[in-house]
Amino acid sequence: MDIKAFEVEEWMNRYEDDAKYNIAETCVESLKVGELLDIASIERNEFFGKLAETKLTYGAIPGSLGLREEITKLYHNKKTTENVIVTNGGIGANFLALFTLVGPGDEVVAVYPTYQQLYSLPEALGAKVRRLRLEPGDGYMPDINKLRTLVKSNTKAIVINTPNNPTGACFGEG
């Protein structure tokens, strides 16, 4: 499998630590553990006492049952914890979804510009990727008629991320 270099990460690795003003960051400023505990109104000594007694195991493959139960509660429908898999962030979730759905010879349509993984991973998996270009004049909103021309009978996936990275455009309903 030939996975292309992740260009934005390579650029950030090269320049972000020495930049006086980092205008390339894609994340919010990180919280310190103490700040997170304060926001959640959790007493630090109690938390760290429990943490010190926590046995370090490999853990449940789909994520801890307690966490999956809490995630399930967020969505008031008939889904169960069996429908929830906890991943190591969006990159891990994207990888699992694309690796599961896409293979050699498949066709994928992906909006562009977008997060590089969303088109380069299907290409690395052997799929032909058709790009639905998001245009500034359209507010970076997808053109449904253009999408219709790109989707073929053998299209395996349509990859859209919202809010779009890097444009920030939020695709609504209708």
What are these regions (language model features)?
Residues 80-84, 104-107, 154:
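Short acidic capping loops at alpha-helix termini that bridge into adjacent secondary structure
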Residues 2-89:
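N-terminal small-domain helix-loop-helix segment of the aminotransferase-like
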